[in-house]
Amino acid sequence: MLLRVAQRRLTCTPDTAESHVLARQRRERSPSFITFGRHGTLSRVNDSLHYTPQSTPAQPGSAPDRRGLFIVFEGGDGAGKTTQLARLQTALEAQGYTVIATREPGGTPLGEALRELVLKHGSNKVDARAEALIFAASRAAHAAQKIRPALAAGTVVLSDRYLDSSAAYQGIGRNLGKDTITDLSRWATEDLIPHATILLDVPLTDESQRMSHRGTVDRIEAEGADFKARVHTAFADIARQNADGAHYVVDGCGSVDTVHERVLEVVRPLLEARELARDNGCTDTRFTPGGFGEDAQ
């Protein structure tokens, strides 16, 4: 069963100054909106980080990544993210799409080195704040060096984890504050958000059972039941709180093929909208920088 958190329509809107001003006004009224590809400032308010994106509207013709598509798989350890990402990559490549599969932490030489540093299961304890900053550093390199260039080339980018994982694991799991960690991630990526975030929803007991068959686990996967329960709840809460965004909750139970078909139910309309926007030269708010978080008009 697929729960589509956000319903939206495809529209073609002229690239005019007025349309950009109206889009900006809608964004400014929505505190949960994250612009795509903007610079901003990271400040400290009441002992918390606060990110303020630049409010300058995008200029017509300044959307080099219009044709790209950025899809993220999220969920707890054992939810099936890596498996479903690989299945989707195979399916899309069979249809002729250029696809890059990547992961977090990782995706770049720096990111992979940081992944080894922060996830290695050893006796060295990593402070929660240091852990969050390591993930943010990996994500900054990932967005700048791999994801943005791929989107600019019209590539479909599939990522195993992204912003929501830090909000869930470090923000809630480590009790650092979801909003604080989200603002840190937004600053690190210059507000690069996915066109779609697919949360694979699997009961916590099933996740634990799947993990028991892996044999070896990393440092975070080895955390206790209370930590995992907080993270599991956090993912569901994040999807629910982003009801006006591009979050999709997909039932992760069942066979690999069954879950794959559910994932395709999410992805097919996105691909169709992407192709329509490209072929007709229209401004689909889902495929222009700064527009994916707002409802089509």
Residue ranges of model-derived segments:
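Walker A (P-loop) phosphate-binding loop of P-loop NTPases
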Residues: G78
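Hydrophobic anchor at the beta1->P-loop junction of P-loop NTPases
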Residues: F73
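NTP-dependent small-molecule kinase module
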Residues: T41-P64, Q89, T205-Q297
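Pre-Walker A (Motif I) flank of P-loop NTPase domains
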Residues: R66-F70
